[in-house]
């Protein structure tokens, strides 16, 4: 209540509160972004942000990784938008496969709304796009005049603290960036943001107002006050250490179970560098 209950418990506007802006800018700078605070749109997490984005634009189809976040597929389906999954490798979405899918879709008369990807510690494969891969994907989008939706819930969760430049930092006027505090603060607070190209701000803000009416000013104030007092470094390092330990525990359990069942060599995986996911592949068939 000391944060200002007379204001925080009232209706709000579809703009990020001034108290939350420093917390967002602190995270954004770590992946080479410099958002304009006036363009930031509040969400109740990136899932709602994704639903807002897909409901704001026309199109029949979203192109994404062949294995992708199930919540994204649900959001696209709820908006009546079909998805086309394209081939991925250890660096995530393949640029040549993306270009082929775009050409094929347009040849068949489909209107492609956007490309969707999680470039850092992707769900579910855990892949990380190199800087060269990111540049190549953005070139395909630029060559075909396509928007790209960047979903970035795990970008701060590298086990060794490494970060990569956000796609948004490399092409600010083509990328719609979805951020969330669910993975770096607490999922129960339900707070995130959209950083869209400048020419799409008002359209997305109108959708935000329709879908949420009043983003939680109280939740934004809680996060903003935490950041004002503590910053992000200590909390992020705690999360990284926790997930690093969990990954080691999981890999140890897998190795022990495969040895116990004489299945060593049947399954392979890449050592995760961060995020939540470990992707297993069967030597005979991918699973």
Which residues does each PLM region occupy?
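Short beta-strand segments
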Residues: 64, 116-119, 149-152, 179, ...
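Conserved core segment of the aminotransferase class I/II
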Residues: 105, 169-241
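All-alpha amphipathic helical-bundle segments outside canonical DNA-binding/catalytic cores
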Residues: 36-41, 268-272, 285-287
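Conserved core of the PLP fold type I
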Residues: 2-144, 149, 155-176, 243
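Feature representing long, continuous alpha-helical segments
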Residues: 96, 100, 135, 202, ...
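Conserved C-terminal alpha-helix-loop-beta "cap" of PLP-dependent enzymes
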Residues: 201, 205, 277-287
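Surface-exposed helix-capping loop/turn segments at secondary-structure junctions
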Residues: 30-34, 234, 254-269
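Conserved glycine-rich beta-strand-loop-beta hairpin in the small C-terminal domain of fold type I
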Residues: 68, 240-251, 263-282
């Amino acid at each position: 209540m000391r944060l200002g209950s007379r204001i925080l418990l009232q209706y709000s506007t579809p703009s990020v509160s001034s108290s939350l802006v420093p917390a967002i800018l602190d995270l954004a700078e770590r992946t080479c972004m410099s958002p304009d605070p006036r363009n930031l749109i509040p969400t109740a997490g990136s899932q709602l942000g994704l639903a807002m984005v897909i409901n704001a634009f026309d199109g029949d189809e979203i192109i994404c990784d062949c294995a992708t976040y199930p919540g994204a597929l649900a959001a696209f389906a709820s908006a009546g938008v079909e998805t086309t999954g394209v081939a991925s490798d250890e660096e995530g979405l393949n640029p040549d496969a993306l270009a082929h899918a775009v050409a094929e879709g347009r040849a068949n008369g489909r209107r492609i709304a956007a490309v969707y990807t999680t470039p850092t510690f992707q769900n579910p494969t855990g892949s990380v796009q190199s800087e060269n891969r990111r540049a190549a994907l953005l070139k395909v989008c630029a060559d075909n005049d396509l928007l790209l939706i960047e979903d970035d819930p795990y970008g701060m969760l590298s086990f060794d603290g490494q970060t990569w430049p956000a796609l948004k930092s490399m092409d600010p006027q083509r990328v719609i960036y979805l951020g969330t505090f669910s993975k770096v603060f607490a999922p129960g607070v339900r707070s995130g943001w959209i950083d869209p190209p400048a020419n799409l701000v008002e359209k997305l803000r109108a959708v935000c107002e329709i879908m949420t009416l009043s983003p939680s000013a109280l939740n934004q104030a809680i996060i903003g006050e935490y950041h004002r007092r503590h910053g992000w470094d200590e909390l992020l390092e705690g999360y990284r250490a926790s997930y690093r330990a969990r990954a080691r525990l999981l890999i140890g359990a897998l190795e022990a179970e495969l040895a116990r069942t004489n299945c060593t060599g049947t399954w392979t995986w890449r050592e995760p560098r961060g995020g939540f996911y470990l992707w297993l592949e069967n030597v005979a068939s991918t699973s």
